[in-house]
């Protein structure tokens, strides 16, 4: 089996972005999060659409999982890369919630950025369906 070094590099870069995402969420570091999102990114959950700017304000003003002594239990569930686009599925336990995030990333000018975040709290429902 042969590997493609470009895909391996992309995979490593995306993993690094996701690790930054996890750390930023855990520590409430909005500057760290802002650096990995495209400025026009939208964050969406059922009934809740926010701009990146609004979400970062929310992150800055809430308590952090780290300050509350909560465990760092974030997990990458999958990464799919097709040329200059990627979709990442994550587990993000935060506070009393258990979020599943889908992050859409695009690679432009050799740099990956998160352009879209969709998330839902599966702690409130048992509606998890895979096809």
Predicted regions and their residues:
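Surface-exposed, charged secondary-structure patches
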Residues: 6-13, 42-98
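Low-complexity, flexible helical/coil segments
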Residues: 70-73, 78-82, 113-114, 123-130
């Amino acid at each position: 089996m042969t590997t493609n070094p470009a895909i391996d590099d992309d995979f490593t870069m995306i993993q690094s972005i996701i690790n930054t995402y996890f750390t930023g969420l855990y520590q409430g570091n909005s500057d760290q999060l802002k650096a990995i999102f495209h400025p026009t990114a939208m964050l969406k959950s059922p009934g809740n659409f926010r701009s990146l700017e609004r979400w970062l304000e929310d992150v800055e003003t809430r308590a952090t999982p780290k300050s509350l002594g909560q465990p760092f239990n974030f997990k990458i569930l999958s990464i799919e890369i097709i040329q200059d686009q990627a979709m990442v599925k994550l587990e993000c336990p935060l506070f009393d919630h258990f979020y599943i995030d889908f992050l859409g990333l695009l690679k432009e000018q050799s740099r990956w950025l998160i352009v879209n975040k969709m998330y839902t709290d599966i702690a409130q429902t048992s509606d998890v369906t895979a096809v």
